Amino acid sequence: MNPNPKARPMRLLIVDDSNMIRSRISRVVQNGGLANVSLVGLARNGAEAVRIARATQPEVVTMDLTMPEMDGVQCIGELLRLLPKINILVVSALSDKSTAIAALKLGARGFVAKPFSDDDLRMALLDVMEAR
């Protein structure tokens, strides 16, 4: 399958309470061969993510689970109600199997445990983007 070079870039929202993690994910997206991705927002918590998602209609979201105001679990539910076709990749330090399974049952399409390598994140993002 040849991607259409004129196709609209896939909109990505990065959600994490750590500025360092938001910056790292952004860097991987911008420098890691994910050419057809447009970063539409950076959110520090779930409540901010919902506000940004309403305005930007992202197709893919990277989501931390442990955040202030609204955690990732609540945010996944809100985003799926708002945008039922959204694809969510959980990126979390809560790396036990039960956490990953719970996130997937909520509707996330993938899970990457922190700390992660750039390659692991890139591959997980590609998998989630292909699922759309």
Regions found by a protein language model. Give the residues of each.
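A Lys-centered signature of the CheY-like receiver
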Residues: D17, K114
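Two-component/phosphorelay signaling modules centered on CheY-like receiver
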Residues: N19-G41
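Acidic catalytic/metal-coordinating carboxylates
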Residues: N45-E48, D71-Q74
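Receiver (REC) domain active-site loop signature in two-component systems and cognate sites
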Residues: M67
